[in-house]
Curated annotation (Swiss-Prot):
Forms a conjugate with ATG5. The keyword DNA-binding does not apply. Its main location: membrane. It is found in: Preautophagosomal structure membrane. One of its GO terms (biological process) is autophagosome maturation. Ubiquitin-like protein involved in cytoplasm to vacuole transport (Cvt), autophagy vesicles formation, mitophagy, and nucleophagy. Conjugation with ATG5 through a ubiquitin-like conjugating system involving also ATG7 as an E1-like activating enzyme and ATG10 as an E2-like conjugating enzyme, is essential for its function. The ATG12-ATG5 conjugate functions as an E3-like enzyme which is required for lipidation of ATG8 and ATG8 association to the vesicle membranes. The lineage of its organism: Eukaryota, Fungi, Dikarya, Ascomycota, Pezizomycotina. Keywords: Autophagy, Isopeptide bond, Membrane, Protein transport, Transport, Ubl conjugation pathway. This is Ubiquitin-like protein ATG12. It comes from Phaeosphaeria nodorum (strain SN15 / ATCC MYA-4574 / FGSC 10173) (Glume blotch fungus). Pfam families: APG12. It is a peripheral membrane protein.
Length: 130
């Protein structure tokens, strides 16, 4: 073996734990904050929200602009619905914006996008905001 090659040391079975099992702390119950967090973990507050679709620029207006959607749905549900209602072809694009501020990802949950009374989604046939 050359001087440049170093060997990786073998595992040493003589390693001692810093504490013995008798000296370690065993929790008999969880702290209050952890217990409360675990009670609500996994249970999503699924409710219906109002979604208002608003055309931007020269985008065609829908006859029905307001509909209800469960908060556990993804944003792509809105985009697919909109594409179907507008009759958009596969090679054409629809650009959607929440509150005329940002374009969420298609996999984003709708429940995290709204606040207040309704979710306002602006849509355009060409990029509307830089």
């Amino acid at each position: 073996m050359s001087a440049q090659e170093e060997r990786i040391p073998e595992d040493d079975d003589t390693t001692e734990a810093p504490l013995t099992m008798a000296a370690s702390v065993v929790l008999t119950n969880l702290p209050r904050d952890a217990s409360k967090a675990l009670e609500t973990a996994g249970s999503l507050n699924v409710q219906k929200i109002t979604v208002r679709l608003h055309p931007i620029g020269s985008a065609p207006a829908l006859t029905q602009r307001v509909f209800k959607l469960s908060t556990n749905q993804r944003f792509d549900t809105i985009v697919r619905f909109l594409r179907k209602r507008l009759g958009v072809k596969e090679h054409e694009s629809v650009f959607c914006y929440v509150g005329s501020v940002f374009a969420p990802g298609l996999d984003e949950g709708v429940g995290g996008l709204w606040s207040g009374e309704e979710l306002v989604v602006g849509y355009a046939m060409a990029p509307a905001f830089g």
